[in-house]
Amino acid sequence: MSIHAVTITELEHHNDRVMFFSVTKPAGFHFQPGQFVRCGVALVSDPKNEEDFLMRPYSIASHPQEDRISFYVARVLDGALTPKLFELKVGDTLYLDDTAYGLMLPSRLEAGGTLICFASGTGLSAFLSIVKDNPWKRFDNVVVVHCARCAKDITLADAFSKTVQQQGREVNFRFIAATTREPDPTLCGEINKRVPQAIIDGDFEKMGFTLTPQWVRAMICGNPAFVDSMKKVLKDRGFTAPRGEKLGTYVAENFW
């Protein structure tokens, strides 16, 4: 494995907690929508060895055919890396592994039905990449559920809307915001509780979804507690993960 120096070409702070940025794409770098790659900073002026870098895995938000690699990152106040990332600007140097990883891939799911992508926080990145790759060639409809604490952290809805419009798939797509700690009732998402609890309470059925493996395929990406809770409620409804070459009805990513 080698580490490439890349340049920040685009950077937008959505608020004091969340930012979206893009870097130059190294020659020969390949990935599949849904995968992640380690990205970070150098700890010394002339980095040569693995210990000279501070790297963390981030889901890729861009499409494989784009000439850039994009990320959606949340600040961790006591984190080692994200405070450094939030100090960067366009033109600065970051570092990227030469290999992408991850098995949260649409191709590991049975085809057909409605694909529901459940994301917490910046786990949403992977689903933007997937939606850019025309998932309707495999599924009838696509739904993205983004769970965040407050409405101000639901920041990529417009990016999804633009992507879907470019593909002419508005009638086959829905974005659902889920807020768990929004103090202003006028800003709450369609779901105003934790998503696993919303499933248990039948909220998705009230919105018109039959959340069973006969009709739905599910993808999960986010923090470990979210992923574990989602896996449990889906398993309780009969969803199964892929095993070997056998396709599943849900797939999850957890790279913490």
Please provide the spans of the model-predicted regions:
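Reductase modules of NAD(P)H-dependent flavoproteins
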Residues: 2, 145, 150-256
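Ferredoxin-reductase
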Residues: 2-92
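A short, basic/flexible loop-to-alpha-helix module at the beginning of a structural domain
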Residues: 100-110
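Conserved beta-strand elements of the Class I
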Residues: 114-118
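Conserved S-adenosyl-L-methionine
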Residues: 135-142
